[in-house]
From Swiss-Prot:
The gene is IVL. Directly or indirectly cross-linked to cornifelin (CNFN). This is Involucrin. Keywords: Cytoplasm, Keratinization, Repeat. Residues 27-36 have a biased composition (Polar residues). The keyword Cytoplasm applies. Residues 164-173, 212-221, 287-341 have a biased composition (Basic and acidic residues). Residues 1-43, 56-347 are annotated as: Disordered.
Length: 347
C-alpha cells in the first residue's frame, strides 16, 4: 500500500530550542511603523506637511535639513539605540520564525504531494485490477460459450454416429473433441475435418451399399441367365449389335476429331500465312520508307550544292563589282591628283 516519505530538515540550535510564535509582518513594514511612530519636532512636521504627497518619507527627511531658520539638530530624531536593538532582535526572531514556518509549510506540501501521488498510483492500480478482472470475466464467458458450443457439437456428432452405427468414427470423434477442449483456436478446423470425414464415410458406405446391390443384381442376373439359357443367343446378338453400334460411334467420333484437327491445322496454316504476309508488308513498307529517306537526303544534298553554287556565283559577282568600283575610284582619284598637280604647276 501507500508509504509516506518525510524529508529531514536541520534547524539552527537557536531555533530548535525556541517555541514557534505567530507570524508577524515583515521587517520592512515594521521599520515603516517605527518610523511613523517616532515623533518629529514641530518645524519638521510643518515642512513635511508642505511637501508634495508623492515624495517618499526618506526624501522628506532629507528636505527637512534645508529649511531656512531651522537648525539641523531640531530636525534630526532623538537617538533610540536600545529600542532599535530590541527591534532588530525581534526582526531576527520573526525572520527565523517565518523561515521555520516556511519549512513547515514546504514539508506539509511535500507530504500532500506524496500522498496525492500515492493516491494516484492506488487509483491506477485499482483501475488496472478492475480491467484485469473484466478481461478475466470476459475470457471465462468466452470459454464457457466455447465449451457449450463444443458440448452441443459433440452431442450432435454422437447422435449422428449412433444413427449411422459408425462406432469407430465415434470413438475418434470423442478423442478429437477431448483434444479440441485443450485447443479452442483449432475447434473450427477440426470440426470441418470431422464433417469431411463423416461425409467421406457416408460416401464410402453408399458406394459399398451400391456395390453390394450391384453384386446382388449381378448374382440374380447370373441365376436368371442360368435359368434362361434359352435366351442366350438373343443376348449375344444384342451384345454384338451394341458392340457394332459402339464401334460405329467410335469411328464417327474419330472422324469428327480428325476433321476438327484438320480444321484447326488449316486455321493455324492460314494464320501463319497471314503472319508471313504481314511480315512481308512490313518489310516492304520499311524498304519504301528507307528509299524515301534516301531520296529525300539526296534531294537535300542537291539543294545544298545548288545553293552553295548560287552563293559562290553571287559572291564572285559582288567581288567583281567591288573591284570595278575600286578601280574606278582609283582612276578618278588619280585624275584629280593629276589635275591638281597641273594647276599647281601653272600657278
Amino acid at each position: 500500500m501507500s508509504q509516506q516519505y518525510t524529508l529531514p530538515v536541520t534547524l539552527p540550535p537557536a531555533l530548535s530550542q525556541e517555541p514557534l510564535k505567530p507570524v508577524s509582518p515583515p521587517a520592512d513594514t515594521q521599520q515603516e511603523q517605527v518610523k511613523q511612530a517616532t515623533p518629529l519636532p514641530a518645524p519638521c512636521q510643518k515642512m513635511l506637511s508642505e511637501l508634495p504627497v508623492e515624495v517618499p518619507l526618506e526624501d522628506a527627511e532629507k528636505h527637512t535639513t534645508l529649511v531656512k531658520g531651522v537648525p539641523e539638530q531640531e530636525c534630526e530624531p532623538q537617538p533610540q539605540e536600545p529600542q532599535q536593538q530590541e527591534l532588530h532582535v525581534e526582526q531576527q526572531q520573526q525572520q527565523q520564525e517565518s523561515q521555520v514556518q516556511e519549512l513547515h509549510v514546504d514539508q506539509q506540501q511535500q507530504q500532500q504531494e506524496s500522498q496525492e501521488q500515492e493516491l494516484h498510483v492506488d487509483q491506477q492500480q485499482q483501475q488496472q485490477e478492475s480491467q484485469e478482472q473484466e478481461l478475466h470475466v470476459d475470457q471465462q464467458q468466452q470459454q464457457e460459450s466455447q465449451v457449450q458450443e463444443l458440448h452441443v457439437g459433440h452431442h450432435q456428432q454422437q447422435q449422428e454416429s449412433q444413427e449411422q452405427e459408425l462406432h469407430v468414427d465415434h470413438h475418434q470423434q470423442q478423442q478429437e473433441s477431448q483434444e479440441q477442449e485443450l485447443h479452442v483456436d483449432q475447434q473450427q478446423q477440426q470440426q470441418e475435418s470431422q464433417e469431411q470425414e463423416l461425409h467421406v464415410d457416408q460416401q464410402q458406405q453408399q458406394q459399398e451399399s451400391q456395390e453390394q446391390e450391384l453384386h446382388v443384381d449381378h448374382h440374380q442376373q447370373q441365376q436368371e441367365s442360368q435359368v434362361q439359357e434359352l435366351h442366350v443367343d438373343h443376348q449375344q446378338q444384342q451384345q454384338e449389335s451394341q458392340e457394332q453400334e459402339l464401334h460405329v460411334d467410335q469411328h464417327q467420333q474419330q472422324q469428327e476429331s480428325q476433321e476438327q484437327e484438320l480444321h484447326v491445322d488449316q486455321q493455324q496454316q492460314e494464320l501463319q500465312v497471314q503472319e508471313v504476309q504481314q511480315q512481308q508488308q512490313q518489310q516492304q513498307e520499311q524498304q519504301e520508307d528507307h528509299q524515301k529517306a534516301e531520296h529525300l537526303e539526296q534531294e537535300e544534298a542537291q539543294r545544298e550544292q545548288q545553293l552553295k553554287g548560287q552563293l559562290e556565283q553571287e559572291k564572285k559577282g559582288v567581288y567583281q563589282h567591288l573591284d570595278q568600283e575600286l578601280t574606278k575610284r582609283d582612276e578618278h582619284l588619280e585624275k584629280k591628283g593629276e589635275h591638281c598637280w597641273s594647276s599647281r604647276r601653272s600657278l
